[in-house]
Amino acid sequence: MARYTGPKAKLSRREGTDLFLKSSRRSLADKCKLDSKPGQHGRTSGARTSDYGNQLREKQKVKRIYGVLERQFRRYFAEADRRKGNTGENLLQLLESRLDNVVYRMGFGSTRAEARQLVSHKAILVNGQTLNVPSAQIKSGDVITIREQSKKQVRIAEALSLAEQSGFPTWVAVDAKKFEGTFKQVPDRADISGDINESLIVELYSR
């Protein structure tokens, strides 16, 4: 299955919420009606969505937020289910601990897609070593740094400036002047932003 490359706003409108697929310079809600489905006048349906439909829709939404394809998402769920604790919370913590997501949370990329590109292009160091695997799991205490040659990229400076204005998550510590951040800890469920109902995903895979 190929990664979606079409209009990002269409995906957010389909889910009825901002998936944060575009730069945060301007709220997506200011650009388009998120409560209107894609299409010339917004698609409508008289039928009520089934429980299965709601569960499937929630899974698709989370996959799109984190830029994960189906096979990989299933692996994340299997690992989350294997671990002790709440499966849904475990799933979100695994997704939040991905290298590309951590780079995004630290403000080095304005979107997860941009952060993923920085990782793939070897612009990111983890504990002083180049790591170009977006799905790599980051652990507490790991230090993320922008490669020296990449610090001159305007897009990184702009993304960092925006992140400083909006504030960083509590589970990362960022030194913008050094282009460096520390992954302090895996976030608790209450610390993970986003309109996500992970219990629907657990119900879907438990069918």
From Swiss-Prot:
Comp. bias (Polar residues): 42-53
Keywords tagged on the record: Ribonucleoprotein, Ribosomal protein, RNA-binding, rRNA-binding
Gene Ontology CC terms, in alphabetical order: small ribosomal subunit
GO terms for biological process, alphabetical: ribosomal small subunit biogenesis; translation
GO molecular function terms noted in the UniProt entry: rRNA binding; structural constituent of ribosome
Domain S4 RNA-binding: 97-160
Region described as Disordered: spans on this chain: 30-54
PROSITE patterns from the UniProt entry: RIBOSOMAL_S4, S4
Subunit structure: Part of the 30S ribosomal subunit. Contacts protein S5. The interaction surface between S4 and S5 is involved in control of translational fidelity.
UniProt-listed HAMAP family: Ribosomal_uS4_B (MF_01306_B)
Similarity comment text for this entry: Belongs to the universal ribosomal protein uS4 family.
Functional description taken from the UniProt entry: One of the primary rRNA binding proteins, it binds directly to 16S rRNA where it nucleates assembly of the body of the 30S subunit.
Classification via PANTHER family: 30S 40S RIBOSOMAL PROTEIN (PTHR11831), SMALL RIBOSOMAL SUBUNIT PROTEIN US4M (PTHR11831:SF4)
Name of this protein: Small ribosomal subunit protein uS4
Organism: Cupriavidus taiwanensis (strain DSM 17343 / BCRC 17206 / CCUG 44338 / CIP 107171 / LMG 19424 / R1) (Ralstonia taiwanensis (strain LMG 19424))
Gene name tied to this protein: rpsD
